[in-house]
A protein has these predicted regions:
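Hinge/cleft segment of the Venus flytrap/periplasmic-binding protein
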Residues: 68, 72-148
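Short, solvent-exposed loop/turn elements at domain surfaces
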Residues: 47, 124-129, 159-164
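Hydrophobic alpha-helical
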Residues: 1-48, 207-226
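Sec-exported extracytoplasmic/periplasmic mature domains
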Residues: 4-8, 26-30, 51, 55, ...
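Short beta-strand-to-loop elements that line the ligand-binding cleft
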Residues: 13, 37-39, 59, 181-186
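Short beta-strand elements at the ligand-binding edges of bilobed clamshell
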Residues: 52-63, 183
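Extracytoplasmic "Venus flytrap"
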Residues: 16-19, 148-176, 180-204, 208-218
Length: 226
């Protein structure tokens, strides 16, 4: 591409903020030229490419991200403490380790999955990016956590990480948490592409909203207030 044509031998290392671009550079130029290339997301193709010389990537702990997304909803629906099944074991035995798997910010009232470096030494542990995390893989009792219906959107259905890793993980967790989820994929450009498919909010018990632009919350809350 343009960078290799312009700089060629001057490029010593390639660092990308996502594996989609990192792998494009690796396959098109860096692999043959033996230039170390690093990405972010730990997508399955990038992890597999480490065996072929891809320098490494960063796992966002997507398995924890997806679990936290649905677990916070599940806890709210069940009327239990928000930390249930997260930092505090639930009755099934699901429990994460704070400081290793996630951190919690009381000020921001937010859970954050913690990043993990994926290298030649440990990449084989990350070859299946859609595998549920063992620590939180136990089925909930449907008599205590009955099936609920959730509307969940992903702002860009074409995003590599969201479509190939995050959504498949959500789909693997929703059954374990007794959630029937309708997944809505946006175009990554306009809020209306998503909100146009929220015409019947009364049909759902909970909503997980991933906005295209972070200042467009009113586009959704206006619909939910009807």
């Amino acid at each position: 591409g343009t960078w290799t044509a312009s700089f060629g031998d001057q490029i010593d290392v390639v660092v990308s903020n996502n594996d989609g671009m990192g792998m494009s550079m690796f396959n098109a130029w860096a692999k043959d030229n033996k230039v170390p290339t690093f990405g972010y997301d730990a997508n399955s193709d990038a992890v597999a490419a480490i065996a072929e010389g891809y320098g490494g990537t960063i796992s966002q702990h997507a398995d924890v991200q997806a679990y936290l997304t649905l677990r916070v909803l599940r806890n709210a629906l069940d009327g239990v403490d928000v930390d249930t099944g997260i930092g505090t074991a639930d009755e099934a035995g699901n429990c994460l380790t704070e400081g290793e798997d996630y951190r919690y910010s009381e000020e921001e009232r937010s859970y954050y999955a913690l990043n993990v470096a994926v290298t030649a030494e440990n990449y084989q542990d990350f070859t299946d990016s859609t595998k549920v995390y063992d620590k939180v893989s136990k089925q909930l009792d449907s008599s205590k956590s009955p099936t609920k219906k959730v509307w969940l959107d992903i702002y860009n259905a074409s995003d590599n990480f969201l479509s190939s890793t995050y959504q498949p993980l959500l789909e693997n967790y929703d059954d374990l948490l007794n959630l029937k989820v309708d997944y809505i994929g946006g175009d990554g450009q306009t809020e209306s592409n998503i909100t146009n498919r929220l015409g019947n909010p009364g049909e759902y018990d909970a909503f997980a909203i991933n906005m295209v632009k972070t200042d467009n919350a009113a586009s959704y809350t206006t619909l939910l207030n009807k």
